[in-house]
Every structure is written in structure tokens, then in C-alpha cells.
Swiss-Prot record:
InterPro entries: Defensin_big_dom. GO terms for biological process: defense response to Gram-negative bacterium; defense response to Gram-positive bacterium. Belongs to the beta-defensin family. Residues 1-19 form the signal peptide. This is Beta-defensin 119. It is found in: Secreted. Its main location: secreted. Has antibacterial activity. Coiled coil: none annotated. GO terms for cellular component: extracellular region. The lineage of its organism: Eukaryota, Metazoa, Chordata, Craniata, Vertebrata. Disulfide bonds join 26-53, 33-47, 37-54. Keywords: Antibiotic, Antimicrobial, Defensin, Disulfide bond, Secreted, Signal.
Length: 82
């Protein structure tokens, strides 16, 4: 019975992976800090650890800091349902 209880507890525990580190986010949690970006990502500026801030290729960055009235704005992102 003790062996069965030990076995159940062992299976229920989350496995510990050595070398697993926290993913650093950038650009308001829309990007990920990596040494090199993937094929579907574009590098944008740098993170605090001197790695590239990788954003998805479909992301658009507004330099002015305010949302512009184009097809990518929040109001025009989805069609309106009447």
C-alpha cells in the first residue's frame, strides 16, 4: 500500500527540467527576448540582456505611441455585427 501511494505521488508531481529559465518578454508582452529571431519573427530594438526583441511579422509598431486610424486599429480589426 505504501508503494502504491508513493507511486501515485511520484506520478502527480511536475517533472523538474534542469536549465529551464524564465522567458523574458518585451514590447508590452507582445515580443520575446531571444539571441536570434525565428523565420516568422522580426527583430525590433534590444532587450535589457542585449538580445533581440522578436515580434511576429504581422505586428505593426506605432512610433508616435498612439493608435492610428488605419486597418490595424482596434475598431477596424473585426467586422461590426449589426
Amino acid at each position: 500500500m505504501k508503494f502504491f501511494l508513493f507511486f501515485v505521488i511520484l506520478l502527480a508531481m511536475e517533472p523538474v527540467i534542469s536549465g529551464k529559465h524564465h522567458i523574458l518578454r518585451c514590447m508590452g508582452n507582445t515580443g520575446i527576448c531571444r539571441p536570434s529571431c525565428r523565420k516568422t519573427e522580426q527583430p525590433y530594438l534590444y532587450c535589457l540582456n542585449y538580445q533581440s526583441c522578436c515580434l511576429q511579422s504581422y505586428m505593426r509598431i506605432s512610433i508616435s505611441g498612439r493608435e492610428e486610424k488605419d486597418d490595424w486599429s482596434q475598431q477596424n480589426r473585426w467586422p461590426k455585427i449589426s
